[in-house]
Amino acid sequence: MVQVKNEGIILQATNLPFENEAVLNPTCIEANGITHMFYRAVRKGDFVSSIGYCQIDEGGKIINRLDHPLLIPEYDFEKEGMEDPRVVFLDGIYYFFYTGYDGKNALIAYATSKDLVHFEKHGIISAQFTYDEAEDLFRQSKALEKYQFFESVLKDRVGEDVFLWEKDAFIFPKKFNGKFALVHRVLPGIQVAYFNSFSELNDSYWRKYFMELDKYIILDPKYEIESRNIGGGAVPIETEDGWLLIYHAVEDSKYGKIYHASAALLNRDDPTQVIGRLRAPLFSPKEEWEKKGKVNNV
């Protein structure tokens, strides 16, 4: 059994207007001996999210924290929030992925930086078609039955014309046969998309991709702890035995949704080949501050 030490809370909301409601869902990367943390900062009132930033020392102590957001919503597709950041360093560039939320649609967007200070936004890279359109494409793959449930959930909750929801995106910190490998999450599983350039990720690319979706599934829910859905967590870590993927597993229980942390080991040359995955969670909500919050049982 894997033992995980709970280090407690390291970052909390402040009285600053951009993060006075909550701070959550961070991503970290080490550079020049410093751990850089980018996190979702939520403000009170309209609950719009921006991206906050701080630095952490080896002991887990905050040594520097901005008193203003590093990145803010600027475009219509992100007007209700920039959420769930992930940062990856590859070939001299920091790739920064996030979910752009416009009040209805949740779509993958990205930015780039060379210094983790100045970022250039490049816009949406995920598919922009409705669940009705996606269903027609899923019919041509073997993925329809597993993915159809969430079509009805989101259409009922958000609206008939909602786009295919995308979250939890990042690239592997290494190319495969010269191609980027983008991990993303169309409910309920985790998938990967390969491409030479981000400019390829257009409507034509995604329509062909979803017609063959079953070829690109890394993980689908399998065990009781992930009975509802799963989604990518930290950027994969390359080991001698394969890629270590930490992901969140959502259990449907009589108490509602429970978010667990889990892990899988993926083939170093083909991440759709799963070497092994945990049946029991790495860790689960135990402390009161994990069971009660802006989202419970996380």
Regions from the PLM with identified roles:
Residues 1-21, 27-80, 89-228, 237-297:
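Beta-rich carbohydrate-recognition and catalytic domains
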Residues 233:
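Catalytic cores of histone-lysine modification enzymes
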